[in-house]
């Protein structure tokens, strides 16, 4: 007898954590298309893949990215593991690549070392459209050569990566942040300017630690106060100026359009000289879809050789949003070439063997499961998007054949079971 007062509590389903997007079909097709297009372009330019850990020692990012950055001071997912070691989910890729290059002595061979990576990165930000706590990125790093031609190659590669997807409504902004020779004098001049402004306590602290960070502040009141701030482009020494002019000249020669933005400051401290960002105005506030720059000095800062480097990170999530804003469709829903419809247990056993043989021959194939009749199973075939459907019942088994239905031409023929794989391979060639 059931107690009237007994209530069965409904089990609540789980949801993804806030700010962590799922890419489920059919949208996952766009995700794969964008990621793979970026990787393909990198491989065409001679970059080799490197697979990095999802988490690293916290000190790697504190030292490499910069303790005064928002990324390190506010946005990192940092925790103590069971051994009481401080580890951090990677917020960006360059520091991890440099750590791996140093650890595995990849910089002791031919230079530049050209590596590409892809995967998720993690930042504790306020979630909104285009800004996620888990962001997907494809990046490249070229390490060991201080050559403006390499800067131009990297920028052109990023530009070509976007255009390979059919994306057109973006623009490239670039500047130079100088180097250790000319930046200190500019830094002092900028700091003197900023400390004479009525800044709030946090912004003043940032101006004292790294005044360039203040120019990266997106608040309207801060941007208004810093409108007349001195600019790095006006304080480059001859070497940095020549480097930057060579980069822009090479981009002109390659037909890569760009705009010079003297106020640009990237969100990471390691950048020097050439710095760039790709902007898409169809995304609202989160308009940056990718960017990068040169980071001479980072390797030495992390305990390696004093070698230069340059790279970029292209945002997969925001690129998908940019494509959607332009009405550009990339990727196709995954379909199988062949779908099997077995009618009865004996047919199911035989069909499983056929499907396995088709897959072994490199033909994508699936089949109907359960005990659905012909009508229900054919609905599954239609939904699969298959080009051919195999129908196998008692009559076909007795005759040693299978009915092969062309789903586009809507015709059907019987083919011997022993020949079905070769016949379908010929039809799909």
Curated annotation (Swiss-Prot):
Keywords: Aminoacyl-tRNA synthetase, ATP-binding, Cytoplasm, Ligase, Nucleotide-binding, Protein biosynthesis. It catalyses: tRNA(His) + L-histidine + ATP = L-histidyl-tRNA(His) + AMP + diphosphate + H(+). The keyword Ion transport does not apply. GO terms for biological process: histidyl-tRNA aminoacylation. CDD domains: HisRS-like_core, HisRS_anticodon. The keyword Membrane does not apply. GO terms for molecular function: ATP binding; histidine-tRNA ligase activity. InterPro entries: aa-tRNA-synth_II, aa-tRNA-synth_II/BPL/LPL, Anticodon-bd, Anticodon-bd_dom_sf, His-tRNA-ligase, HisRS-like_core, HisRS/HisZ, HisRS_anticodon. Its EC number is 6.1.1.21. Homodimer. HAMAP family: His_tRNA_synth (MF_00127). Belongs to the class-II aminoacyl-tRNA synthetase family. NCBIfam families: hisS. This is Histidine--tRNA ligase. It comes from Corynebacterium efficiens (strain DSM 44549 / YS-314 / AJ 12310 / JCM 11189 / NBRC 100395). The lineage of its organism: Bacteria, Bacillati, Actinomycetota, Actinomycetes, Mycobacteriales.
